Structures are given as structure tokens and as C-alpha cells.
UniProtKB/Swiss-Prot annotation:
UniProt xrefs under InterPro entries: Mediator_Med28 (IPR021640)
Family: Belongs to the Mediator complex subunit 28 family.
Assembly behavior: Component of the Mediator complex.
Function: Component of the Mediator complex, a coactivator involved in the regulated transcription of nearly all RNA polymerase II-dependent genes. Mediator functions as a bridge to convey information from gene-specific regulatory proteins to the basal RNA polymerase II transcription machinery. Mediator is recruited to promoters by direct interactions with regulatory proteins and serves as a scaffold for the assembly of a functional preinitiation complex with RNA polymerase II and the general transcription factors.
Major localization listed first in the record, in broad terms: nucleus
Organism annotation: Dictyostelium discoideum
Top-rank taxon: Eukaryota
Pfam families membership: Med28
Name the UniProt record assigns to this protein: Putative mediator of RNA polymerase II transcription subunit 28
Length: 179
């Protein structure tokens, strides 16, 4: 019984490094299971008095070892989740970076097109502008044939006023009106 207590104290004093090796946890769990099975199958008369107490200790040891293993798996799962989130974030950043690069290339391409169009159409525009201004100066004494013809706007309030006046309706009788 003293060796069991010493083993329990040693296992509690030497915490298992969960970061390094899960095999240690599996080995410890396996040893404790073997110890429990050996104890249960052993038929020693001297130990029959303490059977309940020893079984409780063995089961407690087994539960502690399984809890340590469970904690290890939980820590691994949280690490995996954190790594997964980092990878997803990196993928999203990469995707946005590619979109920006594509848009920058598109902007550069259209910027070059605008320059090309400007070099092509600017001389035409300047020559047409020069012709237009020289023609307008030559025709300053004559009525400008390029000026727009003035079209009077209808008097909108008087039209609305005429439409809103009451008029007799032949179908409704002499005194009726339609607005």
C-alpha cells in the first residue's frame, strides 16, 4: 500500500508536459489500467480488507490520467482552431491583395488608354476649335448662323389657369362643372 501512495505522490509531483508528447499520457493511462486489472484479478487474502479503498484509489488515478489526456486534446483542439483562423485570415488577406493588384493593373491599362486617346483626339479638337473660332470672328458682322434660334417658352401658369376653370359639361347638365 505504501508503494501505491508513493506512486500517487510521485505522479502528482511530476506534472506531465502536455506540450511535448501525448504518448506519455497514453502510456500512463495504460499502466494505471493494467494495475487496476491486475489488482482486481488478484485473489490475495491479505488485501481483501482494503479492497474497497484500493479500488477507489485506482479508479481515482485512472480518472486523473484520463482527465489529463482530455485536457491535452482540448489544448490541441484550441491550437488547431487558432491555426485554422490564422490560415483563413491569411487567405482572405491574400485574396484582397490579389483583387487590389488586379484593379491596379486595370487602372494602369485605362490610364494608358486615356493617354492614347488624348494624343489621338487632342490635335483634332484643337484644329476644330481653331476653325470654329476663326469662322466666328469672320462672321461677326453677319448674323451668326451657328447661334441657336430662340424659342419662346409657353406661359405655363396661364395654361394651368385655363385648365382649372369651371366649364359646363354637356353630358352632366347645365349647372354642372368639371375641374
Amino acid at each position: 500500500m505504501d508503494t501505491n501512495n508513493t506512486n500517487n505522490i510521485n505522479s502528482l509531483e511530476n506534472p506531465i508536459d502536455l506540450e511535448n508528447d501525448p504518448n506519455i499520457l497514453f502510456t500512463e493511462l495504460n499502466v494505471k489500467l493494467e494495475s487496476l486489472i491486475t489488482f482486481l484479478t488478484k485473489n490475495d487474502k491479505d488485501n481483501q480488507i482494503f479492497v474497497d479503498e484500493i479500488i477507489d484509489n485506482k479508479v481515482t488515478d485512472l480518472l486523473i490520467a484520463s482527465k489529463e489526456l482530455e485536457n491535452y486534446f482540448i489544448s490541441q483542439q484550441s491550437k488547431y482552431s487558432a491555426e485554422k483562423n490564422k490560415i483563413q485570415l491569411k487567405q482572405e488577406i491574400y485574396k484582397v491583395k490579389k483583387e487590389i493588384e488586379n484593379k491596379d493593373r486595370l487602372i494602369e491599362r485605362y490610364k494608358n488608354k486615356v493617354k492614347e486617346w488624348k494624343y489621338h483626339f487632342e490635335p483634332l479638337y484643337q484644329s476644330q476649335n481653331h476653325i470654329l473660332h476663326s469662322t466666328a470672328q469672320g462672321l461677326s458682322g453677319i448674323e451668326n448662323q451657328f447661334s441657336p434660334v430662340f424659342t419662346p417658352m409657353p406661359n405655363t401658369p396661364s395654361i394651368l389657369q385655363n385648365l382649372s376653370q369651371a366649364k359646363p359639361s354637356p353630358s352632366l347638365g347645365l349647372g354642372s362643372t368639371i375641374l
